[in-house]
Amino acid sequence: MHPVQNADGGSVLQTARNYPIDAATVIDAGAVVKLSGGKVVLAAAAETGAILGIAAEFHSGTEDALNLRANGKWIRVCDNPTLIFECAAPTIKAASGSATTIVPETGDVDAAAADDAFNNAVLVLKEKAANSGNTDALGTQIVVTDYAKTGTVMTKASGGAPGAGDVYEVYPVIGAAIGGVASLGDKRLGITLKTVGATKLRCIGHDYERGAIKLMAIGHALT
């Protein structure tokens, strides 16, 4: 995750603050973090509690001659409740489809994602497989009109038929909570669709040119 701005103004990094952390805790800069027992830890992949913010520095948990804070007792966190942050849009690969459907590869979308979970999400064709006959141009934006849990079928307006291996970026509906559609990745640095999660994040913007989505916390530790 990359802190972008505070919605209520002020520099993101200038408003970052020190919080206690166990010396051995491993957190990467950009990770979504929370408080546990008064100390900073990684947010859970399917976090249901309040989020503190985004780690502003690396804390490797081991001694580092070039970074005396690497295993220190403090870590800086961008903690403004109005913090806007961004990450790369998650991607899926098509396994099959038609002029009006896209079926992601097995495992690219969690099988537990509910019916309609991706309705009104926007897909952007990022890459075509070598043998793809897809007639859509790279960069084509496709609105998902319906999502069926059975078969993980995404319905769309008539257009190019996806080839197996075609790659699409997925942009969740603006204003929608990510929970139930995606969860935080292993290091809490981005969003994955492979696992359904109750992440306390809300999508508030799309940046199609840079392939990024903008997010805010739904529940915050300081409010």
Predicted regions and their residues:
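Surface-exposed, low-hydrophobicity beta-strand/loop segments enriched in small/polar/acidic residues
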Residues: M1-T223
